[in-house]
Amino acid sequence: MRVLVAMSGGVDSSVAAARAVEAGHDVIGVHLALHKDAQQTREKARGCCSLEDSADARRICDKLGIPFYVWDFSEEFKEAVIGDFVDSYARGETPNPCLRCNEKIKFAALLRKGMALGFDAVATGHYATIDSDGYMRRSLDENKDQSYVLGVITKEELDHCFFPIGDTPKPQIREEAKRHGFSTAAKPDSYDICFIPDGNTQAFLGRSIGLRPGMIVDTEGNELKEHDGAWNYTIGQRKGLDIKTPTADGSPRYVTDIDAATGTVTVGSRADLAVTHIEADRLKYLHPAMEGDFDCEVQVRAHGSVVPCHAHVDREADRMTLELNEPLSGVARGQAAVLYLPSPDELGDIVLGSGTICGTE
């Protein structure tokens, strides 16, 4: 099988490439160039797309004796990921750019190009598995499971993917990399937003969106202070509110709602963050069971709590509603709601699909 391995320059994709070679596949490594800024480095950040990362990926491919290429997806990334990130915050949402990158670039765009060039599959270093029926499962390594950030791809895309390291504990991956003599064996994991290398999201959004003054109010509508832009805030935020007027009982305040149209940011108690009803659109399907009415579990952030719920999915309307069996806090518009079926066997939970949260109660 002709396999294209997406090489981030980290230890996970390094070992994924090695395992693909060991399995006897015809393998090439590809690093995705997502930025035009050639000066962006990893020196002060833990992103995944720097010049240093590209050089690390090349060294691994050289050691494995496989071809290495850099494919430029910077224009697609700018529009589909960075543009979406800015637009979502401007709408008062809380997007996850890594999910959008997986959805639009690392799978959709990469697969299109790979298939056009005659490749049979794309392999990545993600922690998830695909069962014998072709459905995605959680990794059994719960601490590293990445099925949530993969829940936004389609079944058609999944059919051309595989995850060589999906169920292997991370310490074992690092040991395997050491045995291969890979320079990435001890390389730290990436977690920063790659297009905000200094980690200052508010400054980035301020430059991108500009000042849009509005008011912070309490749940009774009382005005507490003016702000420079609703994009400064996310649902569940407690730090950085800088509200001088204390609550009657001295309890902390949290952001409970953002109305981007009026610029109004509402703050309330921790109890005000609890939701038991979620609505989502922009649905993605990974399993035929994601249709009609059914019981399942939902996760709304990477490594977040998993809550049982009853789902109603209307494929024709591209809409789903979730009635939660127990409250979830800090659920924001723009986040992904990924649905799971509890595992019926020794493998991880089954990933049904996902939707983008557009409303809560």
Swiss-Prot record:
Q: List the residue(s) that the UniProt entry marks as the site Interaction with tRNA.
A: H126, Q335
Q: What is its main location?
A: cytoplasm
Task: Please tell me one Gene Ontology term that the record gives under cellular component.
Answer: cytoplasm
Q: Name one GO biological process term.
A: tRNA wobble position uridine thiolation
Active site, UniProt feature:
C101 (nucleophile), C194 (cysteine persulfide intermediate)
**What EC designation does it have?**
2.8.1.13
Where does it reside?
A: Cytoplasm
What this chain does, per the entry, is described as: Catalyzes the 2-thiolation of uridine at the wobble position (U34) of tRNA, leading to the formation of s(2)U34.
Q: Which HAMAP family match?
A: tRNA_thiouridyl_MnmA
Protein family (similarity comment): Belongs to the MnmA/TRMU family.
Protein name, per record: tRNA-specific 2-thiouridylase MnmA
Q: What is the originating organism of this protein?
A: Corynebacterium aurimucosum (strain ATCC 700975 / DSM 44827 / CIP 107346 / CN-1) (Corynebacterium nigricans)
